Amino acid sequence: MGNDTIANMITSIRNANLEKTKTVQVPATNITKNIGKILLQEGFIENFREHEESKNCFLIFTLKYQGKKKKPYITTLRRISKPGLRIYSNHKEIPKVLGGMGIVILSTSEGIMTDREAREKKIGGEILCYVW
């Protein structure tokens, strides 16, 4: 049984948000790098960088907070398609999160992208997670 790196990343970010931690470290894989790029592009995180320690490679996410109470920009981060139950959708049936306020991250034949990009390109794929 393998590790679910996406669920590991989501849980690490969720826990860091609860503790109001500025940075979080997750194992680097191609999928986590691409999801990190999307989160950065959509404005959910401040920054992320790659860090190599001995032979292990990590991504360090700098989380974004607003106001004096440090309210996190990422309210909810939910894993949808899991290793035991994959969820796929064509471009017409990709769900909208909070009426378009949140994003759906999909794994498509053209790479990992948001729901808006997938609808524009008219391609479906595996629904990885919801972010809002």
Curated annotation (Swiss-Prot):
Domain of life (superkingdom): Eukaryota
Pfam family, one: Ribosomal_S8
Subcellular location: Plastid, Chloroplast
Transmembrane segment boundaries: none
GO MF term set: rRNA binding; structural constituent of ribosome
rRNA-binding as UniProt keyword: yes
Leader sequence residues: none
Protein family: Belongs to the universal ribosomal protein uS8 family.
Biological role stated in the UniProt entry: One of the primary rRNA binding proteins, it binds directly to 16S rRNA central domain where it helps coordinate assembly of the platform of the 30S subunit.
Cross-referenced HAMAP family: Ribosomal_uS8_B
Descriptive protein name: Small ribosomal subunit protein uS8c
